[in-house]
Amino acid sequence: MSAFTPASEVLLRHSDDFEQSRILFAGDLQDDLPARLDTATSRAHTQQFHHWQVLSRQMGDNARFSLVATADDVADCDTLIYYWPKNKPEAQFQLMNLLSLLPVGTDIFVVGENRSGVRSAEQMLADYAPLNKVDSARRCGLYFGRLEKQPVFDANKFWGEYSVDGLTVKTLPGVFSRDGLDVGSQLLLSTLTPHTKGKVLDVGCGAGVLSVAFARHSPKIRLTLCDVSAPAVEASRATLATNGVEGEVFASNVFSEVKGRFDMIISNPPFHDGMQTSLDAAQTLIRGAVRHLNSGGELRIVANAFLPYPDVLDETFGFHEVIAQTGRFKVYRAIMTRQAKKG
């Protein structure tokens, strides 16, 4: 996170305006501008664990990671700089949360790429902080307003759910496949063998659907789930609880917080981080899996067929198999053998 995003470059055009401000940065924080911009004070709140990791190294306790921001997270701030995400319900959750805590009179800046739909911020905040566009550059828009009325925020109203083969999946804004089971996960599930035993790690667990579906026909597996997203962690916990499935769920940047080894690692790894395409997480998953698999253990992932994972799998494990495929997706399997690099 050294190079600035287009949204941050637009903000830097106005850097003089922020020197005396006590700023809260929030939203899709893809770089470390919150730690580097010259301000009176800077705080940051993010729902993304990997963004918090970067910012906390420079900002310490002034960078916070959680699903819901608290009054302590926004204390003494007189300005909000909000980076618009690609997901509108996610923006609504975060902005209603933050504006319910910030005092009336707070300066509100919203910045984002045009393709992310940032212009819809005007309508979303019309009743609370009417916005005007103050800059347009780098295919981004920058909007400014002042908080006139605090919204009432209730996180419980943002929960959703759907059913998959008799299982109830709990979801929140910002969670992958929020409105239903995606085709890739469906293909991966079709390959899982009933009556599997052992320790299973679900990396990038989303709403937890892979784990609960696996546990239904393999009740003796011991589940661990992790994700970078605070909404995903909470959704997975709720999905497990609703379906009576036990498992440990926590935030982790791929393997950063994972301890121990497993008999199987499953994943539908992301290849987007916000608006940006990124293969980093999946490549880290493949290369790091050898440090978290028991001998004979298995990595099983689903991915878009066009993504360049076979080479990384072969380089790391010595070989791989394609055990299911459609026109769009492939399910890859790699086994932990003596051929595998030990990382």
UniProtKB/Swiss-Prot annotation:
Keywords: Cytoplasm, Methyltransferase, rRNA processing, S-adenosyl-L-methionine, Transferase. The keyword Kinase does not apply. SUPFAM superfamilies: S-adenosyl-L-methionine-dependent methyltransferases. This is Ribosomal RNA small subunit methyltransferase C. Pfam families: MTS, MTS_N. It is found in: Cytoplasm. Monomer. GO terms for cellular component: cytoplasm. Belongs to the methyltransferase superfamily. RsmC family. It catalyses: guanosine(1207) in 16S rRNA + S-adenosyl-L-methionine = N(2)-methylguanosine(1207) in 16S rRNA + S-adenosyl-L-homocysteine + H(+). It is an enzyme of class 2 (transferase). Its EC number is 2.1.1.172. One of its GO terms (molecular function) is 16S rRNA (guanine(1207)-N(2))-methyltransferase activity. Specifically methylates the guanine in position 1207 of 16S rRNA in the 30S particle. The keyword Nuclease does not apply. It comes from Escherichia coli O6:K15:H31 (strain 536 / UPEC). It comes from the Bacteria.
